[in-house]
């Protein structure tokens, strides 16, 4: 099965040892536009296995970008590059963001990646896209600019030792801008005032479509970190009810995939089933469902949940939208890999 992975035929998704360089070469270098679930796994293994060789990571991921047209893979490459948070990766992301012919999901992720890397030089890059014709890119760049300005606010001092400044800022990024609980660089930097807000106030901000998007994002991540029934239900509700911003709903889906709370199941399935929803939201929902279904919980209740997730992902692995269909295959691969099982998709 090549190209669009949701055409006819069947495939068996099953465990394959991926923690080696041969797997990475097989699926990111030798394979083009097929076996998307293995390509995605190879992408994350590449980041880990070559973590001490950034030049090789750049070579492999650049090759993958140049030789694959899957929006899902290209988008995820941009995400991984941003999370690596190395200034050597700036040029790759700038090229993606500059390309107005590139899919907006990829451009969105490139802008987020530039903010995650945090270089002060990225501020002027991001400013150029604040009036982009794509609302998803505009909104992402607004958030990215806010994040970059916060991360670099100490870089404007007149100290003569610029290298020392850069090292201090880099350490601050590592210490303050990475989620300790989820080990990710979030797309917004929290303000201290947000720490004192009550749950009700955060939920109000989350649902208020009239406030700046950054404020809603701050509420989103604060509620994620609480990991309570109330906070997860609030996130699930806004995933379904929000009408203002696709990138916001996509981030809600991503966060629910991090939280791995069973209360999110009905909201995620409802969102995936909504074929009128933006593809970037449904794609993220499919991945979140895969994560939720890959837990090793030995209870009948969870087995029922897992069965429903597998059935749903199988159904939408044939979705008319390629990025959604591929994301469902990747979600199924999460389950197959983590639980060492085989899943047949007809």
UniProtKB/Swiss-Prot annotation:
Keyword Oxidoreductase: yes
Keyword annotations of the record: Hypusine biosynthesis, Iron, Metal-binding, Monooxygenase, Oxidoreductase, Repeat
Single GO molecular function: deoxyhypusine monooxygenase activity
Binding annotation for Fe cation 1: 75, 283-284
Record SMART domains: EZ_HEAT (SM00567)
Pfam families, A to Z: HEAT_2
EC numbers on record: 1.14.99.29
Binding site for Fe cation 2: 108-109, 250
Pathway: Protein modification; eIF5A hypusination
Cofactor annotation remark: Binds 2 Fe(2+) ions per subunit.
Cofactor: Fe(2+)
Positions of HEAT-like PBS-type repeats: 71-100, 104-133, 213-242, 246-275, 279-320
Reaction(s) catalysed (UniProt annotation): [eIF5A protein]-deoxyhypusine + AH2 + O2 = [eIF5A protein]-hypusine + A + H2O
Function of the molecule: Catalyzes the hydroxylation of the N(6)-(4-aminobutyl)-L-lysine intermediate produced by deoxyhypusine synthase/DHPS on a critical lysine of the eukaryotic translation initiation factor 5A/eIF-5A. This is the second step of the post-translational modification of that lysine into an unusual amino acid residue named hypusine. Hypusination is unique to mature eIF-5A factor and is essential for its function.
Miscellaneous comment: Inhibited by the drug zileuton in vitro.
Family classification: Belongs to the deoxyhypusine hydroxylase family.
PANTHER family: DEOXYHYPUSINE HYDROXYLASE, PBS LYASE HEAT-LIKE PROTEIN
Name this protein carries in UniProt: Deoxyhypusine hydroxylase
UniProt source species: Plasmodium vivax (strain Salvador I)
Lineage of the species this protein comes from: Eukaryota, Sar, Alveolata, Apicomplexa, Aconoidasida
